[in-house]
């Protein structure tokens, strides 16, 4: 029987598979206890959600109302997410019944998800399209907060920017939340510019409404020993040089590091001493899983956009307008280069990190290089 894989990614990571962040965990726990609203800002797959769950595990007698806002498109979507999160907050169905009762004006219906067996609440879409309906669902949170010690997490909060009534939605949310002074709201987001705009723009209703807690890459001195120990748990021997090579390949993004280490584990046997020779087989496994997606993503690009992407893979993203880069990318002008970059960012293929453009998925970069484009 094959041993359980010691690396986890693409999900909330808890227990032994979670690499501790003691300072951040301690800060977040103290903010939650104090009812201090917090903004968690970090790039994709840095472990923000896992950090929140680790903080929750350290809090006795606190409930967490976790609301995932990814891909919301309407006010009705937002209301449904909050109501469903409230209904699922406890093991007992009393939360679902109370959620239905407290939101009676929105004509909610209760169903059971056939896969998870968890309750799902849907409000009347016509009633919920009025941004003022958000006040009803926040009032639901307020009622629960009076009865339970809880904190609220809005994950992927930048998705609110997608709503047609964005400004009104933010204003109503802020207007209700500011009176829940004993309840901590954690706003987590992976699109840094959008989160910064919501919480630092003087014109935003959420201006200076929460403390910012940055979630950077794990320090090498913490993450490397953790990974070496996890490999040892899987009967593989990794040294610091190998781990450093993994860091360089993945831009030190927590989730991508775990994914690559998982692929290494899959392509090696017990007792293996890991070296550079194990990198290519692990990449081939990832390409087998994600190659069709990479092909689809690049097939939609124009010639200029594709050439720009390949040049970024070859030369990196710091000297975009240098003569060498422009020649490699075959860009006719700086305007054409800027236009191609804008499209690649909009498509979620790259993002700006400081003054450097990086691949959202570092394995797309290595895939492009492996193809010899």
Where in this protein do the model-derived segments appear?
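A short, basic N-terminal segment
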Residues: 1-38, 43, 351
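C-terminal leucine-rich, beta-strand-based interaction scaffolds used for sensing/assembly
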Residues: 2-5, 288, 292-373
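C-terminal helical "lid" of AAA+/P-loop NTPase domains
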Residues: 243-249, 255-269, 307-310, 342
């Amino acid at each position: 029987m094959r041993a359980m894989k010691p690396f986890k990614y693409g999900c909330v990571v808890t227990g032994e598979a979670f690499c501790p962040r003691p300072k951040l965990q301690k800060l977040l726990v103290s903010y939650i206890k104090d009812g201090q609203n917090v903004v968690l800002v970090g790039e994709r797959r840095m472990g923000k959600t896992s950090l929140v769950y680790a903080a929750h595990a350290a809090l006795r007698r606190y409930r967490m109302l976790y609301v995932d806002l990814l891909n919301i498109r309407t006010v009705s979507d937002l209301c449904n997410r909050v109501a469903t999160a409230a209904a699922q907050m406890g093991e007992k169905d009393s939360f679902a019944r109370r959620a239905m009762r407290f939101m009676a004006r929105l004509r909610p219906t209760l169903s059971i998800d056939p896969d998870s067996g968890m309750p799902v609440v849907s409000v009347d879409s016509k009633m919920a399209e009025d941004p003022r309906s958000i006040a009803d669902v926040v009032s639901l949170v307020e009622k629960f907060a009076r009865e339970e010690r809880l904190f609220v997490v809005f994950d992927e909060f930048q998705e609110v920017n997608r709503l047609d009534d964005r400004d009104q939605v933010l204003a109503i949310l802020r207007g209700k939340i500011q009176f829940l002074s004993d309840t901590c709201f954690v706003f987590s987001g992976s699109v840094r510019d959008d989160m910064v705009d919501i919480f630092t723009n003087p014109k935003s209703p959420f201006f200076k409404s929460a403390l910012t807690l940055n979630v950077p890459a794990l320090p090498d001195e913490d993450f490397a020993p953790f990974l070496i120990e996890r490999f040892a748990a899987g009967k593989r021997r990794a040294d610091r040089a190998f781990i450093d090579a993994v860091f360089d390949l993945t831009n030190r993004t927590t989730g991508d590091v775990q994914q690559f280490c998982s692929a290494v584990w899959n392509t090696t046997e017990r007792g293996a001493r890991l070296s550079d020779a194990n990198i290519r087989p692990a990449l081939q496994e990832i390409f087998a899983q994600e190659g069709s997606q990479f092909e689809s993503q690049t097939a939609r690009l124009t010639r200029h956009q594709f050439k720009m992407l390949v040049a970024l893979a070859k030369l990196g993203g710091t000297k975009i307008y240098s003569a060498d880069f422009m020649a490699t990318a075959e860009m006719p002008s700086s305007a054409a280069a800027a236009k191609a970059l804008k499209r690649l960012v909009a498509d979620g293929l790259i993002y700006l990190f400081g003054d450097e453009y990086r691949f959202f998925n570092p394995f797309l970069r290595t895939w492009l290089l492996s193809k010899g484009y």
